[in-house]
C-alpha cells in the first residue's frame, strides 16, 4: 500500500477529533490546491475564478460517489473495492498502466485506490460530507445536550468524530490526487449554517446545521470555522 493511500486511510479511520494544528494545516493546504486547480479540467467562471463545472477530458471511467453523510467506512470500502480490469481495457491504453505493459501480465482486478493513484479513473463525490442520516436517535440525544447549553457533549463528539474523519479523508484525497479526485459542494457543505448566497440553513432530525456550527466554534474556534467555510466556497 502506498504512503498516500495509507495516509488517506489513517484519516478515514481516526477515532478521535483531529488536533487544532493538524486541522488548520490541512484546511489551509487543501484550499491552496483548490484555488490553483488546472483550468483544463476546472474552467474559470464569470468571475475569473475556478468554477463548479468539471470538464473531465480523459477517456477513463468516472466513478460517481453519492452523499457520504459521516460514513468514513463508505469511502474506505470504495477505495478497497476491486474493479475487474476488463472494465478499464476499452478506455485505457495498456502502456498507460506502467508495470502491466505486457498484456499477459494484466491483473484480473485492481482496487479503486490503486487505479486512482495511476490516474486510470476519476472519483467524483457529489457532496454532503457531514450530518449522519443513519442515527436519528443520536440526533435526538444531541438535541437534548444542545438545548441544555452543551455544544460539545459526548454524543455530539461521537457524531463529529465520524464527520471529521470523512472531512479529513476527503481533503487528503484531494491533496493526493487533485486531477482525478473531486468533491462537489452539496447543500450540507454549509458550516456557517447560512441562508445566503445560494446556501440554506439545514435541519432534518434536529437543528443539525446550527449544532455543528456551535460545536466547531466551541471546540476549535472561529478560525477553523472560517477555514472550513473557505474550503467549502472553493469546491
Label every model-predicted segment.
Residues 1-235:
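Feature recognizes metal-dependent phosphohydrolase scaffolds
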